[in-house]
Amino acid sequence: MLKDQNLDIERKQDHIEINLTQNVESTLKSGFESIHFIHNALPELNYDSINTTTTFLGKSLQAPILISSMTGGTTRARDINYRLAQVAQKAGIAMGLGSMRVLLTEPDTIKTFAVRHIAPDIPLLANIGAVQLNYGVTPKECQYLVDAIKADALILHLNVLQELTQPEGNRNWEKLLPKIREVVHYLSIPVIVKEVGYGLSKKVAESLIDAGVKVLDIAGSGGTSWSQVEAYRATNSLQNRIASSFINWGIPTLDSLKMVREVSKDIPIITSGGLKSGIDGAKAIRIGANIFGLAGQFLKAADTSESLLFEEIQLIIEQLKITMLCTGSRTLKDLAKAEIRL
């Protein structure tokens, strides 16, 4: 057990370091570069009237932005999560925590995840890999993770390709959907299912919605490639070559968003995966997202300072607001109907 615990911590340290120092982007594009808003030269709007507010999980957001799940479990991760939480609270946006599996075996790591005292008002998301349900994690333990950080929802992340290219990855993905359904019905709060950078297909979205999942985070291709992250962690050339061969794998984020929105007009969708700016976020809202998530650039900023992170989030919000004004969109509902060309 101790060996497994140490491996969890080591893996989390590796993931932070690799994401900060190596190029681990997918060679696929997110797809949003193919969408262009029709510029409105006479918007008849006052910038001060632009309204980016929305609601998510019953809470108000000042902008439709999620700091996507990144890390936890280590001292460096604690510092990063504290900065993320401080800035999320200040900016009025949502935040996801990194995988909390380590908390089930290392209770002391709670201090690296517990940020509710820093961010009392924002939607806060607990997180664990869905495949862990095939390796002994129970619905009761999922509720424990939620309670431990006073979360508003639980993310069950789907990372099959990452696990299969990871030296110590889990390989049994059989009969997982019934276990997801069981967690959905057991928990006192909503379950979000999230991909980690390869997208959700129409078929998978249909299955998850049927299982009672309340929110989908499509996390398509175009951003971080976790198989490429694992290529840097490989302990031999064969593992490296296997992982590296999947750098262009997945469903581009735009395609995944269209697929999932076709399945349901109503389910809340978080769009992440390769979004680089508030302009990309605006495009995601236009195509059908409720909120949009970013991770990589926030991680780099948060590893440096709270002020740099806040500037990065201000940049995203300002880009979003300018896009709204230049499309004649006073609200996010207006933005969802803005003119575009493909």
From Swiss-Prot:
Ligand binding (Mg(2+)): E163
Entry's EC annotation: 5.3.3.2
Keywords: Cytoplasm, Flavoprotein, FMN, Isomerase, Isoprene biosynthesis, Magnesium, Metal-binding, NADP
Chief localisation class: cytoplasm
Subcellular location field: Cytoplasm
Pfam families referenced in this protein's UniProt entry, alphabetically: FMN_dh (PF01070)
Listed GO biological process terms: isoprenoid biosynthetic process
Entry's family note: Belongs to the IPP isomerase type 2 family.
Protein known as: Isopentenyl-diphosphate delta-isomerase
Organism: Rickettsia rickettsii (strain Sheila Smith)
